[in-house]
Amino acid sequence: MSDATKKVALITGGNKGIGLETARQLGALGITVLVGARDLKRGEAAAAELKREGIDARALKLDVVDDGDRKAAAEAIGREFGRLDILVNNAGIATEDMSANSTLTTSEETLRKIFETNFFAVVALTGSMLPLLRKSAAGRIVNLSSILGSLTLHATPGSPIYGAKMFAYDASKTALNAYTIHLAHALKDTKIKVNSAHPGWVKTELGGAGAPMEIVDGAKTSVRLATLADDGPTGGYFHMGDTLPW
């Protein structure tokens, strides 16, 4: 069993981009970070990079859409640590072109593929990890959403996203926000806090090189929500210090 005084965080999709930077920033706070990665070798490379920076990092084979991986990850964390303090549901995919409204052209296959990773896998993995999170003195769940999941902003002419419509991706993040609200309510009598984070438009594989934000800033909202004090919010939707409309 590892040091019982150190917090333990699992970051899905933690081997690159915002996930890796989230692991880096949490690790810099003295938190043990578990780098969840679909490809174990890439996860190990990311963990090795963090270790060179003095961070207690471990790689964990975790394809979020694989039920066997989800169960094995929960069992491994339980054996090694006996609990989980922080779950950052960071892994996500997008396959649509933001330059055109895809509502009339998105295939059922695309809808199912995106929802499988961005919504169903999050629900399933969180369910697998909840028994471990309940053993934490202050469990925190962060669902990496997007401003593109805001129905209010999508429906408001002149909003920052009114002209940006990626139907499957946007809908998957709206569904994820609904899960955040419902899970926070279900856990309202516990010490676990659940929130949705919008990282911003960040220079990643998903965001593209033309995005205005650097990765170091894109991780800040997730890190803040992962380390909330006992009097912090739950069931919210945030970017940096701002609350976003559902």
Language model feature labels by segment:
Residues 174-177, 189, 196-197, 204, ...:
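C-terminal helical subdomain
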Residues 29-45:
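Conserved glycine-rich Rossmann-like NAD(P)H-binding loop of the short-chain dehydrogenase/reductase
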Residues 11-12, 89-90, 140-146, 193-198:
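Structural signature of the Rossmann-like NAD(P)-dependent dehydrogenase/reductase core
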Residues 69-72, 113, 121-128:
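Conserved mid-core alpha-helix of short-chain dehydrogenase/reductase
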Residues 40-41, 61-75:
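The beta1-alpha1 cofactor-binding region of Rossmann-like NAD(H)/NADP(H)-dependent oxidoreductases
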Residues 53-56, 76-89, 95, 107:
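A glycine-rich helix->loop->beta "capping" turn
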Residues 2-34:
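Canonical Rossmann dinucleotide-binding motif of NAD(H)/NADP(H)-dependent dehydrogenases/reductases
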Residues 93-115, 120, 134-188:
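Catalytic loop of short-chain dehydrogenase/reductase
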